[in-house]
Design a protein with these regions (language model features):
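Catalytic helix-loop patch of NAD(P)-dependent Rossmann-fold dehydrogenases
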Residues: 1-50, 54-64
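C-terminal catalytic core of Y-nucleophile DNA break-rejoin enzymes
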Residues: 65-66, 100
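C-terminal substrate-binding subdomain of Rossmann-fold SDR/epimerase-dehydratase oxidoreductases
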Residues: 71-190
Length: 190
């Protein structure tokens, strides 16, 4: 059984793929380079970023599950692949913690001000809520009132079954609540 724990800033870091290894290497370089210097710095651990901020003309979307689904809708191609259906999750598909770009911008602003008086901070930037890949697809189906044809692919051996942030430090330091953690708010801009 896969543990349903949330990852906090002090959790043991055990990357399962090269992407995770590169993120950890960058954290180590930043910490090693700056810990004994006068520089103030933050390590922000992004979970799965979605959305865009069209009001500010920053409308380049990040390549994510949400973008893949919205591109399929745009092209009227309602076929989609899911990598794996035998995970120990609510519906067998991988679970992720998604955070909207608007919430990330608010976090960045608060971290910038925090660093004026504090040397360093490491923060999880996630919603603290898990959604499975299938739940995300079903939410889009509900929004567009149309079903997707889903094909399940062989699971990548490096695929993480479930991941979720413990964002309690973020809430404690900044009284920051993630405003777009409900699935319908996450898909609203797509």
């Amino acid at each position: 059984k896969v543990p349903r724990i949330k990852i906090n800033e002090n959790s043991s870091l055990k990357p399962v793929n090269y992407y995770g290894l590169s993120k950890l290497a960058c954290e180590n370089i930043i910490n090693y380079s700056l810990q004994n210097k006068k520089n103030h710095y933050a390590i922000l651990r992004y979970f799965n970023v979605v959305g865009s901020i069209t009001d500010l003309k920053i409308n380049k979307k990040i390549y994510s599950l949400f973008d893949v689904i919205s591109k399929r809708i745009e092209k009227k191609n309602y076929k989609i692949n899911i990598n794996g259906k035998n995970f120990d999750t609510v519906d067998g598909t991988p679970e992720r913690d998604f955070i909207h770009m608007e919430d990330l911008c608010k976090i960045h602003d608060k971290v910038f001000n925090y660093l004026k008086k504090n040397k360093q901070v490491t923060l999880n930037c996630g919603s603290g809520k898990r959604y499975s890949v299938l739940e995300v697809i079903r939410a889009f189906e509900k929004k567009i009132k149309r079903k997707f044809y889903i094909t399940y692919k062989i699971t990548n051996p490096d695929e993480t079954q479930t991941i979720c942030s413990d964002n309690s430090l973020l809430k404690e330091l900044f009284r920051q609540d993630i405003t777009k953690k409900k699935i319908y708010n996450l898909i609203k801009n797509y």
